[in-house]
A protein has these predicted regions:
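C-terminal scaffold of the Radical SAM
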Residues: 1-150
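Residue-level detector of family-conserved "landmark" positions at structurally sensitive sites
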Residues: 4, 49, 155, 172-173
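Hydrophobic alpha-helical packing residues
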Residues: 35-39, 162, 188
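Intrinsically disordered or highly flexible coil/loop and linker segments, enriched in small
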Residues: 138-139, 168, 198
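Short amphipathic alpha-helical interaction segments
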Residues: 149-164
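A short, conserved structural fragment
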Residues: 163-173
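Minor-groove-contacting beta-hairpin "wing" of winged helix-turn-helix DNA-binding domains
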Residues: 174-178
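Short, amphipathic alpha-helical interaction segments positioned at domain boundaries
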Residues: 180-199
Length: 199
């Protein structure tokens, strides 16, 4: 597995405090295209938005994330996702700082867990597609039902819009993100976000 994506300047890093000169969007696109061509020539296949591998060597760990699978967060600052038979989906975050993590572990009161929240039904479509549309492979419609616990009718209007915009194509059993959908991935994902209720 090889990841090929643009450097993100994160807060509290040397790059953040002393940012390098970054290429403009046209140069970034040229760099991405050149990398894509060289990887393809070397026998690597793109299987996620920024992930390449030799055939049969996709990162199973990443595939589980992108297919909205469950995983345990173990260690300082780790994140987890757990689905339960009663339909709940829970996101967890462990204590970030090692000293606090060890102190919480030693006290054994909800050991080393910093936050835990239930993913609301209205947030599940966005969470599902935010992960699933990172993959190049077609998305089985049944995966949406199986992993979110929601019927397809909850997203039909948005799916129809995405197809009309050219972001997705559809068969009776699958959705496929298009080249245009990859370019406008943020717009596509925003369409699945729950609307904020006004009070």
């Amino acid at each position: 597995h090889l990841s090929w994506y643009q450097l993100t300047i994160e807060p509290n890093t040397m790059f953040y405090y002393k940012p390098p000169t970054l290429p403009d969007d046209d140069d970034l696109w040229d760099i991405f295209e050149l990398g894509h061509q060289k990887l393809a020539a070397a026998g690597y296949v793109q299987y996620e938005i920024s992930g390449y591998s030799k055939p049969g060597y996709q990162c199973q760990h990443n595939l589980n994330y992108w297919r909205f699978g469950d995983y345990l967060g173990i260690g300082c600052g780790s994140h987890g996702k757990l689905s339960f038979t009663d339909g709940r989906i829970i996101r967890t975050t462990k204590v970030k700082h090692p000293r606090g993590y060890l102190a919480a572990y030693q006290n054994m009161v909800k050991p080393y867990l910093h936050t835990e929240h239930v993913v609301a039904d209205e947030d599940r479509p966005f969470e599902f597609f935010m992960n699933r549309f990172r993959l190049i492979e077609a998305c089985p419609k049944q995966d949406y039902v199986d992993t979110t616990g929601l019927p397809l009718s909850t997203i039909q209007e948005t799916i129809s819009w995405a197809i009309e915009m050219g972001y997705l194509s559809e068969t009776p059993t699958h959705w496929q993100i298009t080249e245009k959908g990859k370019l406008f991935l943020n717009d596509l994902l925003e369409a699945f976000m729950a609307e904020e209720s006004e009070e």
